[in-house]
Amino acid sequence: ALVETFKRLGHEVKIINLHNPRISDTYIYHFWRHENNMYLNLKETISCLILRKGIKRENCFKKFINLFPLTRQYEIGDEIDEDFDCLVCGSDQVWNTKIIGERAISYYFLDFGHPLKRISYAASSGSNRFADGNENFFKGILSKFNKIGVREFFLKKYLHESLDLDACFTPDP
């Protein structure tokens, strides 16, 4: 919805195609991960091998994401070398450092490049208090944002109380 809105407003839109193993590995089945529960292991093995559950989910996601205008694929650790006038991040769990992993923080918090503007729209951290113990680091990154929009009242309050940053509430597109 956000991509279409930006296009209707006359902007050229590209989604940065970032491959994050922490995310993509959730589609891969890990045999016998429940050490003490043979029933769960057997159930998940059948689900994976016979029903191809993880494979179907990954293929659906790939088809969906390829509908959008993507940059070339970047890996964690790559320098994003494209010029953008504005960077926008947001939506489900984008600032949940437990999900994205520490090595990916600079990408999901837009700490790269030299855009004229940085904006978050409906950014979410779940219930994760990502800055605990690293307040100065995250305040430095988020202070580069021109506008911060979050989808959770918890996160709006957390940014204000912990990092002294103002955010507005924006609904998830």
Give each language-model segment a name.
Residues 86-87, 147, 166:
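Beta-sheet entry/capping signal
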Residues 79-80, 142, 159-162:
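Alpha-helix C-terminal capping segments
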Residues 18-20, 153-154, 172:
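An acidic- and aromatic-residue-enriched active-site/binding cleft used to recognize and process polar
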Residues 114, 144, 162-165:
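Short, structured coil segments at secondary-structure junctions
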Residues 2-140:
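Aromatic- and Gly/Pro-rich donor/ligand-binding loops
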